[in-house]
Design a protein with these regions (language model features):
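Active-site-proximal, glycine-rich beta->alpha crossover segments in alpha/beta enzymes
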Residues: 88-169
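N-terminal basic, low-complexity leaders that serve as flexible interaction/assembly modules and, when applicable
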Residues: 1-89
Length: 169
């Protein structure tokens, strides 16, 4: 009989003692093994786009703490990147994207999307293969408004045009 994952069981209405545990930002500044890998790499975006590194970072907190779920190490800007947007990470400021002035600036070739998203797909496959049968794999996505706030400068100038071009104004 297949053992049900604790998190899935609770989401299906079961009561579990102890309850399943995970943290939304499992990989990050607090783990020494993450900090060591980040220091060697020097680039958050490189880590996101390297399936071997992203797999390792996803699994680090699960191995260390025995969490009931692993959260895939990636970034919400993976999809805008696949759409041809120039993704920029500035130390101390965070991510940004150039303003979109029309939908014409977005990549429409789905083969290019697949190529640019291939590292994310490979990371998902690697993590799934390395997780035990009791550990849930969680993903995430950026909502249109969240992504729209990253287009343009850190001020609201340029965001109105981006929102209009994306059809979310």
């Amino acid at each position: 009989m297949k053992e049900e994952k604790a998190l899935i069981g609770v989401l299906n209405g079961e009561k579990r003692i102890p309850p399943p545990i995970w943290l939304m930002r499992q990989a990050g500044r607090y783990l020494p093994e993450y900090r060591e890998l980040r220091a060697k790499t020097g680039s958050f975006w490189t880590m996101c786009n390297d399936p071997e590194m992203a797999t390792e970072i996803t699994l680090q907190p699960v191995r260390r703490f025995g969490f009931d779920a692993a959260i895939i190490f990636s970034d919400i800007l993976t999809v805008p990147y696949a759409l041809g947007q120039r993704v920029k990470f500035t130390e101390g400021e965070g991510p940004s994207l150039p303003p979109i002035t029309s939908a014409d600036g977005l990549e429409r070739d789905s083969e290019i999307w697949r190529q640019k998203l291939a590292p994310a797909y490979e990371t998902l496959q690697r993590v799934r293969k390395n997780l035990d049968s009791r550990t849930t794999l969680l993903g995430f996505a950026g909502a249109p408004w969240t992504l729209a706030t990253l287009y343009g400068s850190r001020s609201w100038r340029g965001r109105t045009e981006s929102c209009q071009a994306l059809g979310i104004s």
